[in-house]
Amino acid sequence: MNKLTRARISVEALLGQIQSGERGGTCVFLGTVRNDGDVTAIDYSAYDEMAREEIVRLIDEAQARWPAAKIIVQHRLGVVPVGEASIAIVAAAPHRDEAFTVCRHMIEEIKKRLPIWKKEIHADGTSTWVDPSGKQIAGGLRDS
């Protein structure tokens, strides 16, 4: 289930696909939409095929580096309200240190490389484009 989705992320479903008797450590990272001031939601958009291919490439690279680990990534697209998860990364490995390391590696690489754009939706109905690091784009590109 390494994919993009427009539905709510089910951690239970992801865990059901990854846990096994060979992996004693499982790390789950959830990135949730937070209320920065007057933000009510974030609208995530992507060129789906390119984003899917990059997720697969990122997982393949991590699997080559940590062959005993299993990794699942799921990223939401569309409008995600405050408090809901926009991304889930689940990494299972024989031991907890490896699971934590893989999970951290994945979120850092995703933030650098995954071509997904976000637009903050504000309580007053306006929206602001945000770069992948979370900073508003210079010039304050704000839609009304």
Task: Annotate each PLM feature.
Residues 1-85, 92-104, 108-144:
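N-terminal, polar/charged subdomain of small-to-medium soluble alpha/beta proteins
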